[in-house]
């Protein structure tokens, strides 16, 4: 990677149990650190507008915070129940939201319950108030020991940006010259979209978090980040998805207790490289469920996923990009990210892209590293069999596609495909794998019984040469 770092000598990226420096070696000058950030627990005191909860959930996801409690003015709980609920949540930050002046008394009562429930918590949670000035003054009078700050309406883009900025400031915890990993990834996605003059989706899975970022060529970026991962946060994936939903992606019969022990071992050995095919299959399964739940949470919070699904470029980073085979990275992304058109999927192994994004996030000039194009993915659901034409340096190949098809066509040199029903003609330079035609349908479903599920997974894995032969 060629990088102009100005006053920064190197970028140091923190992982679960190690740090990587780019460029490697001793730093002769200032070091910019990239960190995951601290866990921030957010509680919400809500007025009667039903859109407030969704707007706050969207803001919390964008800021990488955990939304641990929602308490409404009309939720039916008693004063003591509200106080106990907030005490158990142990929030670092409380956001009070009201758009209707009729909510003033109810919101002040919630603030009183907060003071009652969290009186012994140290430090006391800061309170961000997105409401009329008179309501903010009454909340300040009810909670004199808490720090009170004003916040714009979180239902607006400006309000969400202000909330995200405040959440990220708390996550840094005054750790000096640092950039949060999700900040760096968003800056990198923005730079890639501007350079490519096309929408870009970046999927990042690490041991402790998962990010889905959609960047447009006009510089607009929407990102969601959640503490679901394949290492220290693997148990959170299992808690959210359930062990059966993780196990369903493993192409062999595995007893639940043995699989659960492997999940918890991942937290004991952060950044460990999978030592067996089963361990690798588990990491891939956890990555699938982590991405799927982040997307589901984003949709529930009001984020429209249609523009992201239509993006022509998808880039994989983190542990997802460091899987031993490119086909492994590809199939994880394909199984859970439902693209609606032809997509060029690439991966950026290592930390060069994160380092470039960190520099860009701090206003430094950085040249993006080269990423590795894996495949052009053509997702289809034809009513009747259709023909896809693929042109590369060897000539033209015609592939007849019917529902349920899942095939890889190896290519050489510059590749262009022509699909029925669209004028878009994806084109790419040398691809590591080739063109993948996916007519499995969406949402992707697996048979519940092992006798049907395992052959289905084996067929999909064999099509892309995903796993070694002993598990097929």
Regions found by a protein language model. Give the residues of each.
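Well-ordered mid-protein domain cores that form the structural environment of catalytic cofactors
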Residues: 45-97, 101-103
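Short glycine-rich, Thr/Ser-proximal phosphate-binding strand/loop in the N-terminal lobe
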Residues: 3-5, 9-26, 64-69, 220-236
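Short beta-strand-loop/turn "lid" adjacent to the catalytic site in phosphate-handling enzymes
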Residues: 28-53, 321-325
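Gly/Thr-rich phosphate-binding beta-strand-loop-beta motif of the actin/hexokinase/Hsp70
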Residues: 1-21, 41-44, 83-103, 192-219
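Conserved phosphate-binding catalytic cores of ATP/NTP-utilizing and phosphoryl-transfer enzymes
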Residues: 1, 27-38, 71-89, 116, ...
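Internal, well-ordered domain-core segments that constitute the primary functional module
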Residues: 82-159
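Helical "lid/coupling" subdomains associated with nucleotide-phosphate turnover
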Residues: 177-202, 206-472
């Amino acid at each position: 990677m060629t990088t102009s770092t100005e006053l920064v000598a190197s970028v140091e990226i923190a992982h679960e149990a190690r740090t990587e420096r780019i460029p490697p070696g001793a730093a002769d000058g200032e070091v910019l650190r990239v960190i995951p950030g601290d866990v921030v627990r957010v509680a919400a005191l809500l007025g009667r507008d039903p859109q407030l909860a969704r707007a706050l959930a969207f803001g919390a996801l964008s800021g990488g915070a955990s939304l641990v409690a929602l308490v409404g003015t009309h939720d039916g709980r008693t004063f003591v129940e509200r106080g106990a609920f907030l005490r158990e949540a142990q929030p670092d930050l409380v956001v009070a939201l009201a758009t209707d002046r009729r909510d003033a008394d109810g919101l002040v009562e919630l603030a009183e319950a907060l003071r009652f429930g969290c009186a012994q918590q140290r430090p006391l949670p800061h309170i961000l108030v997105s409401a009329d000035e008179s309501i903010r003054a009454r909340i300040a009078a009810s909670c004199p020991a808490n720090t009170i700050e004003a916040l714009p309406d979180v239902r607006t883009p400006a309000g969400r940006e202000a909330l995200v900025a405040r959440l990220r400031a708390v996550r840094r915890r005054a750790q000096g010259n640092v950039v949060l990993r999700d900040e760096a990834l968003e800056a990198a996605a923005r730079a890639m979209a501007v350079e490519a003059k096309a929408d870009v989706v970046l999927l990042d899975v690490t041991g402790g978090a998962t990010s889905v970022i959609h960047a447009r060529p006009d510089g607009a970026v929407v990102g969601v980040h959640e503490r679901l991962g394949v290492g220290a946060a693997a148990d959170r994936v299992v808690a959210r998805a359930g062990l059966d939903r993780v196990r369903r992606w493993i192409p062999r019969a595995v007893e639940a207790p043995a699989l659960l022990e492997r999940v918890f071992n991942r937290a004991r050995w952060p950044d460990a490289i999978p030592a067996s095919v089963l361990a690798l299959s588990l990491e891939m399964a956890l990555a699938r469920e982590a991405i799927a739940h982040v997307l589901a949470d984003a949709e529930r919070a009001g984020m429209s996923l249609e523009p992201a699904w239509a993006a022509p470029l998808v880039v994989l980073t983190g542990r997802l990009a460091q899987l031993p085979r490119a086909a492994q990275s590809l199939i994880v992304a394909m199984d859970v990210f439902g693209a609606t058109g032809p997509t060029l999927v690439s991966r950026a192994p290592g930390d060069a892209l994160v380092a470039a994004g960190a520099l860009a996030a701090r206003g430094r000039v950085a040249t993006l590293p080269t990423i590795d194009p894996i495949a052009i993915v053509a997702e289809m659901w034809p009513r009747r069999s259709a023909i896809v034409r693929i042109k590369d340096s060897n000539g033209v190949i015609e592939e007849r596609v019917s529902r349920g098809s899942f095939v890889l066509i190896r290519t050489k040199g510059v590749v262009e495909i022509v699909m029925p029903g669209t004028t878009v003609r994806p084109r790419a330079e040398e691809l590591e794998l080739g063109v993948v035609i996916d007519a499995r349908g969406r949402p992707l479903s697996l048979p519940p019984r092992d006798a049907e599920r395992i052959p289905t997974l084996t067929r999909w894995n064999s099509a892309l040469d995903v796993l070694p032969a002993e598990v097929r």
